[in-house]
Amino acid sequence: MKTLGEFIVEKQLDFSHATGELTALLSAIKLGAKIIHRDINKAGLVDILGASGVSNIQGEDQMKLDLFANEKLKAALKARGEVAGIASEEEDDIVIFDGGRAENAKYVVLMDPLDGSSNIDVNVSVGTIFSIYRRITPFGTPITEADFLQPGTKQVAAGYVVYGSSTMLVYTTGYGVHTFTYDPSLGVFCLSGEKVRYPATGCMYSINEGNYIKFPLGVKKYIKYCQEQDEATQRPYTSRYIGSLVADFHRNLLKGGIYIYPSTASHPQGKLRLLYECNPMAFLAEQAGGKATDGVNRILDIVPEKLHQRAPFFVGTKSMVEDAEGFIAKFPDEEAK
C-alpha cells in the first residue's frame, strides 16, 4: 500500500530541480480534504446544512458547507507558506496572503471548495476542485489578479476530491492522472489508480435534460443522436446526470462518457466557471486521454478576462466530445427564445 504522501515524494525525486514546495502545497490540500470529509460525514448531526443566508458574487445562495469548506481550505493553504494567495468561487476577489513568506511563494491556487453543495442536504456526492499555477508577478511583491488570469495550459497541477461512498482524491501534475482512496481508519489517502485513462469508447452522456428547450440546436441534435438505436456505435447511450460536476466527471472518467453543460437562452456564456471548474477538469481530462472544449474551442487555450468568467463545457471521452462538436458545427447555434 502506497500513501498519497509517499507517492508525491517518489514522483518529486524524478525531477532533480524539484524543491518540494509543490509537494507541501498538495499536502495542504490533502489536509483540507480530510477536514471537509470529516464534517460532511456528520453534516446531518451539526448545524452546517442548508443556506447560509448570503449570496456570492454570481448572486447564488451560498450553502453553509460552501463557506465552511472555503475557510478550511484557505486556512490550510495559508498555513503552509507555499501559496501567495487564492481565488475561490466563494470569494468576490482574490485573497492575498500576508507575510514575507507568502510574498515570496511561487504558487497561487484557484478552487471550488464544495462543488454540488446543493446536493448535500439529500446525501448526494459532492466534491472539491483545485487548480495550481505559478505566479507571474515578481517575487517579493504582492500578487495581483493577473497571476490568476492565465490560460489553463499554464496549470502546474489540478485535481478534485469526491466525497461519496468513499472519499477519493484525483490529481495530475501533467504526467498522468492518479487516484487515491481515503482510509478513515488510518487517516491516509492510499493509491488506488495510477495513470488512469478514459476507456476508448463511452456509453454515457451527462446533461440536465430538464433544460432541453433552452439548448442550442446542435446540442439538441446530439442528444437525439445519443438516444437513437444503432448497434454499430452501441447506441442508445445511457443517460446519467447527478448534478454534481465532480461526481459526474468521475463516473465518466472510469466508465467512459461525456459531460455537457452548454450555453442556454438564460446563460448564453454557459454556467460553469472557467477558472474554478472547467480548466482543472479539462487538464485532468486531457491527461487521461479525453477532451474538453466549449463546443468549438479547446478549454485550456481560452485566455480568461475575469475571475468568475463562465464557459460552456463539453468534457469526457475524446470520440464523444468530437461527435458533439460535429453536431454543433453542422447545426449553427440556435437557442430557444
Curated annotation (Swiss-Prot):
InterPro entries hit by this protein: FBPase_C_dom (IPR044015), FBPase_class-1 (IPR000146), FBPase_N (IPR033391), FBPtase (IPR028343), Fructose_bisphosphatase_AS (IPR020548)
Required cofactor(s): Mg(2+)
Binding site for Mg(2+) 2: D112, D115, E277
GO cellular component terms, A-Z: cytosol
Gene3D superfamilies, sorted: 3.40.190.80, Fructose-1,6-Bisphosphatase, subunit A, domain 1 (3.30.540.10)
Broad class of the protein's primary localization: cytoplasm
Cofactor comment text: Binds 2 magnesium ions per subunit.
UniProt-annotated binding residues for substrate: D115, G116, S117, S118, N208, Y241, K271
Gene Ontology MF: a single term: magnesium ion binding
Record keyword Lipid biosynthesis present: no
Entry keyword rRNA-binding: no
Binding-site list for Mg(2+) 1: E89, D112, L114
Keywords: Carbohydrate metabolism, Cytoplasm, Hydrolase, Magnesium, Metal-binding
Subcellular location: Cytoplasm
Top enzyme class: hydrolase
Entry EC number(s): 3.1.3.11
Pfam families the record matches: FBPase (PF00316), FBPase_C (PF18913)
Subunit: Homotetramer.
Family: Belongs to the FBPase class 1 family.
Protein's name according to its UniProt entry: Fructose-1,6-bisphosphatase class 1
Organism: Yersinia enterocolitica serotype O:8 / biotype 1B (strain NCTC 13174 / 8081)
Gene field: fbp
